């Protein structure tokens, strides 16, 4: 038993381990998206950079949760990371729509985690999840929604290429 553990329920600890897996899974999916757009037959460097950045952000979220788990006296239990459901996308629009769906799943998981903390009256736990994660999730969902709206507006082909260059700042490597 950890010396620093206080009011940290086993259900909160298990929930953090589950969320670590969710964040690593999201990182894995975003990395798959990034390297799809980096392929020579897709060549949308802005999408590549955007999704690579999202992958790193999700990985950092997992690391922050692992640090928190240790700080509260919990134990990190890593689980297998599921393979992404797909390996390629027909367009940037479809990838952004999948990214929005993923962010909503992560957000739902975080909200369920807060509910666990509330059930066990762990205010520190709830504050941590609310302050470090939920606001960022809402911002990500808004950004992706805006991107989807604009990708629908500009269409495939030249519109998608222009979005890649102008909005995502894709440049030739």
UniProtKB/Swiss-Prot annotation:
Top EC group? oxidoreductase
GO biological process entries: intracellular iron ion homeostasis; iron ion transport
Query: One GO CC term of this entry?
Result: cytoplasm
Q: Name one Pfam family in it.
A: Ferritin
State where Fe cation 2 binds: 58, 103, 137
Q: Where does Fe cation 1 bind?
A: 23, 58, 61
- Ferritin-like diiron domain boundaries: 6-155
Q: Which reaction does it catalyse?
A: 4 Fe(2+) + O2 + 4 H(+) = 4 Fe(3+) + 2 H2O
Keyword Nucleotide-binding attached: no
GO terms for molecular function, please? ferric iron binding; ferrous iron binding; ferroxidase activity
UniProt keywords, alphabetically: Iron, Iron storage, Metal-binding, Oxidoreductase
Its source organism is Schistosoma mansoni (Blood fluke)
Name of the protein in question: Ferritin-1 heavy chain
Assembly, per entry: Oligomer of 24 subunits. The functional molecule forms a roughly spherical shell with a diameter of 12 nm and contains a central cavity into which the insoluble mineral iron core is deposited.
Q: Which PROSITE patterns match?
A: FERRITIN_2, FERRITIN_LIKE
């Amino acid at each position: 038993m950890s010396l620093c553990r206080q009011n940290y329920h086993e259900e909160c600890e298990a929930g953090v381990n589950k969320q670590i897996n969710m964040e690593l899974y999201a990182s894995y999916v975003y990395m798959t998206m990034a390297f799809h757009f980096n392929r020579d037959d897709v060549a949308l460097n802005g999408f590549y950079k955007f999704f690579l950045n999202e992958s790193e952000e999700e990985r950092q979220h997992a690391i922050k949760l692992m640090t928190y788990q240790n700080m509260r006296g919990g134990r990190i239990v890593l689980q297998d990371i599921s393979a992404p459901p797909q390996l390629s996308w027909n367009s940037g629009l479809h990838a952004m729509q999948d990214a929005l769906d993923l962010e909503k799943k992560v957000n739902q998981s975080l909200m369920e985690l807060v509910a666990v903390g509330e059930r066990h009256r762990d205010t520190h736990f709830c504050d941590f999840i609310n302050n470090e994660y939920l606001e960022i999730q809402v911002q990500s969902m808004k950004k992706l929604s805006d991107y989807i709206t604009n990708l629908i507006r500009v269409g495939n082909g030249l519109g998608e290429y222009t979005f890649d260059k102008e909005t995502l700042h894709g440049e030739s490597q």
